[in-house]
Regions:
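Export/targeting segments at the very N-terminus of extracytoplasmic proteins
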Residues: 252, 354-411
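Helix-turn-helix repeat elements of alpha-solenoid scaffolds
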Residues: 173-185, 210-220, 245-255
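Catalytic and substrate-binding regions of cell-wall glycan-acting enzymes that process beta-1,4-linked
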Residues: 476-536
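Generic helix N-cap/helix-start motif at coil->alpha-helix transitions
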Residues: 28-34, 44-50, 59-66, 74-83, ...
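Short, functionally critical alpha-helical segments immediately adjacent to catalytic or ligand/cofactor-binding
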Residues: 387, 392-415, 427, 455-460, ...
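Substrate-binding/active-site groove segments that recognize
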Residues: 400-401, 418-441, 454-463, 485-486, ...
Length: 553
């Protein structure tokens, strides 16, 4: 009887957390739901399906055959799914494992295949010339590795490397680590080598390694010769412009930013290049041009603030029919159908269809998503859904939740990312599990699709980040996306410390991980807009926000 009462209570509590007046019929929110192969087979390939395949693979006592069937239903590009499957079900051949784990002395007794498997370039760099010669003499069947070792064994690694082929140079550059790059490659590279590198598919990756390492200043200056290269992408030109700014050459930076603007397709990329053209020239015509942009990002909002122009395309409320919607807001696959359907041919007739589907407060985020697409993002919605939950927090916390949730999920409860982040606040499963333990709550991964639960956990996580980063919205955003440890490591490089000519904008561009860098800017723009809407008695300027971006480390 007690067990039945507990089960009934748990079911009631789950339903209460969903909605005061609604009991969800979503299958995976039902008690004792378990992913099966039959259930998976009915679902289309998507990030959502990959998430549920992961839940299936994590079940106990699963046969290899069934695990393989489920794995092969996936997208094929999901790194998390691949890792889980390989770690749990795919075994390395014993002979290969032996070679991977072998010490240098043990490898000396092995054949050429085992040496090729077990000896990395990084390990080879630490070997004596005698040991290098020993391995070189055993590697005739593996000429690429043999020649790599010959270069490492030479008296002039740099000269031999730059006179080798471009693939080998790239392999050494990426595989041998930061110390090797600083000690051996921090030189003014020959123009012909730079030009060859610029044609490689890994060139932007190469640039990130160079530009974000202040110890590679000589190599950085080698890149100036690309200022007139018309084949480079907008993003490559922009990064080269930042590199020129870091090396105190505003004239060359101007060339790169100008090329970046002309090559850019996305409005945000055009605005970013325009803003930096303004910074390196102080020419107000670039601000004027920025102020005409329809996108509300930190660059355009700041330009409008400096020119005393009020944004005219921010929408905070939307009229609804206020009838109960039949749309299942928890079903990721239903939402995926909407996303696909609105990608093209979104005309008045189709828009009216969604006005008739998304009719209540629960589906307000879904409607504004469609409206933004319909308006080609030239009208931007800063709605405040889930007020019954979020209004209970202080204003700063409300602003942070809305700023992050808008960027993370557009407030869609059923959102699932490629990395399996869930819900309105896009919380990773490992994090939600950890939070449940700290809150001493029973854990059900599917409850993260319920806004009440997901926002509660997101708020808990924000509390820890707010303490670590002094309530600074930009640093909190970096940590929410890239992790607190990564954010601290970036700040400890000296970012957001100086009060230089281009700060804090230069520090904002020196965050090494692209997703985190751009995420922070978007959340900061959201923060500015939401603060001045929800906290209208204490409005804040972007200038003031920028002045507050000072590292606590």
């Amino acid at each position: 009887m007690k067990k039945q009462l507990f089960s009934l209570t748990a079911t009631i509590l789950l339903n209460l957390s969903i909605s005061a007046n609604e009991i969800s019929t979503t299958d995976f929110l039902q008690k004792d739901f378990k992913v099966t192969l039959d259930w998976l087979e009915q679902k289309p390939k998507s990030y959502a399906k990959d998430f549920f395949i992961l839940q299936y693979l994590n079940q106990d006592n699963l046969s290899f055959e069934n695990a393989k069937i489920a794995y092969e239903m996936g997208n094929g590009t999901n790194a998390t799914l691949k890792k889980v499957f390989n770690d749990k079900y795919k075994k390395t051949a014993p002979i290969d494992l032996k070679c991977y784990r072998a010490t240098i002395e043990e490898l000396k007794d092995e054949d050429s295949k085992c040496i090729a498997l077990g000896l990395s370039l990084k390990e080879a760099l630490q070997l004596s010339k005698k040991d290098l010669e020993f391995f070189i003499n055993k590697l005739d069947p593996y000429p690429t590795l043999k020649y790599d070792l010959k270069i490492i064994a030479s008296d002039d690694i740099y000269t031999n490397l730059i006179n080798s082929d471009i693939k080998r140079f790239s392999r050494f550059f990426f595989d041998l680590g930061s110390n090797f790059r600083i000690k051996v490659l921090n030189k003014k590279l020959p123009p012909e080598l730079i030009n060859k590198l610029s044609k490689e598919k890994d060139f932007e990756r190469f640039l990130r390694y160079v530009v974000y390492d202040k110890n590679l200043n000589n190599l950085q200056k080698s890149l100036f010769i690309l200022k007139d290269d018309k084949s480079l992408t907008s993003s490559t030109n922009f990064l080269l412009g930042i590199n020129a700014v870091n090396n105190n050459d505003a004239k060359i930076a101007y060339n790169f930013f100008f090329n970046s603007f002309n090559k850019a397709y996305l409005r945000i990329d055009k605005d970013k290049a325009l803003f930096w053209l303004y910074l390196v020239t102080q020419n107000n015509s670039f601000l004027q041009e920025l102020s005409k942009s329809w996108d509300n990002n930190i660059y355009t909002l700041y330009a409008k603030e400096l020119l005393d122009i009020k944004p005219d395309n921010l929408i905070y409320t939307v009229d609804l029919k206020n009838t109960k919607s039949s749309f299942d807001i928890y079903d990721a696959f239903k939402w995926m159908e909407v996303v696909e359907d609105t990608k093209k041919n979104l005309d008045d007739t189709k828009l009216q269809k969604y006005y008739d589907i998304f009719t209540d407060e629960d589906t307000l985020p879904h409607l504004t998503f469609v409206l933004e697409r319909y308006n080609k993002y030239k009208t931007q919605y800063y709605i405040t859904p889930f007020r019954n939950i979020i209004k209970n927090y202080d204003v700063y916390k409300q602003v942070m939740i809305y700023s992050i949730a808008r960027q993370e999920s557009h407030f869609i409860p059923s959102s699932i990312s490629f990395s399996s982040a869930q819900g309105v606040m896009q919380i990773m499963p490992f994090l939600s599990l950890d939070i449940s333990k700290k809150l001493n709550e029973n854990y059900n991964i599917y409850e993260q699709f319920i806004p009440n639960k997901n926002i509660q956990y997101g708020s808990f996580h924000l509390d820890t980040l707010m303490k670590q980063f002094d309530n600074n919205p930009l640093f909190i955003a970096y940590a929410y996306n890239g992790g607190a440890g990564y954010t601290r490591s970036q700040l400890k490089k000296g970012l957001f410390k100086e009060k230089g000519k281009f700060e804090p904008f230069l520090s904002m561009e020196m965050i090494s991980f692209n997703e985190t860098r751009e995420y922070g800017k978007k959340v900061l723009a959201n923060y500015y807009i939401y603060n001045n809407y929800l906290n209208s008695e204490n409005k804040i300027s972007l200038s003031t926000i920028f002045e507050s971006l000072v590292s606590p480390y």
